[in-house]
């Protein structure tokens, strides 16, 4: 599993980092960034909560890895 954060939608509310600091941080521009680490079973709950708390729905959890570039990692 991996987390993808849509930088075009992110408004820098910080709910993702407040909810799951193990998975998210904020960049110099104030927008959310996904930390480069796997989403372990222990982190899946906080990841889902971050998805729910994002006010602009900029975060999603993908079960399969896609090719290409994204702001998220994992």
From Swiss-Prot:
Names of required cofactors: [3Fe-4S] cluster
Keywords: 3Fe-4S, Antibiotic biosynthesis, Electron transport, Iron, Iron-sulfur, Metal-binding, Transport
Residues involved in [3Fe-4S] cluster binding: 10, 16, 54
Name of the protein: Ferredoxin MycCII
Entry's Gene Ontology BP terms: antibiotic biosynthetic process
Pathway(s) annotated for this protein in UniProt: Antibiotic biosynthesis; mycinamicin biosynthesis
Cofactor binding summary note: Binds 1 [3Fe-4S] cluster.
Organism: Micromonospora griseorubida
